[in-house]
A protein has these predicted regions:
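Enriched for short, Lys/Arg-rich terminal
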Residues: 67-97
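Basic, Lys/Arg-enriched alpha-helical interface segments
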Residues: 1-62, 80, 94-96
């Protein structure tokens, strides 16, 4: 059973940048996005394979969960879900590492 969520440094930076960007214009929307994101990630603790395989990188073993217009790329490792990237859906994502 998966018991925790972790962020790589890059993913944490991307997530915080998205929240800060929203907060500058709409603080309430930023707070709601942060809360929805954390809820979606917590759901992965119970259902770690519920995210879809990333269409751009189907052979790499990464999955994604969508929150609004943002894509959270993650991988399963031991008892953890590791978020490896956070992208707006208008961005072309880098290959997860």
């Amino acid at each position: 059973m998966t018991r925790r969520i972790g962020f790589t440094p890059r993913a944490r930076s991307q997530f915080l940048a998205a929240v800060e960007y929203m907060h500058a214009e709409r603080p309430m929307a930023a707070r709601a996005f942060r809360n929805r994101s954390m809820e979606a990630l917590r759901n992965l603790i119970r259902f770690p394979e519920s995210g879809r395989v990333i269409p751009e990188f189907p052979d790499l073993g990464f999955r994604e969960v969508l929150v609004g217009k943002y894509r959270f790329f993650y991988r399963l490792q031991g008892d953890a879900v590791w978020v490896v990237g956070v992208w707006h859906d208008a961005q072309i994502p880098d290959e997860p590492a």
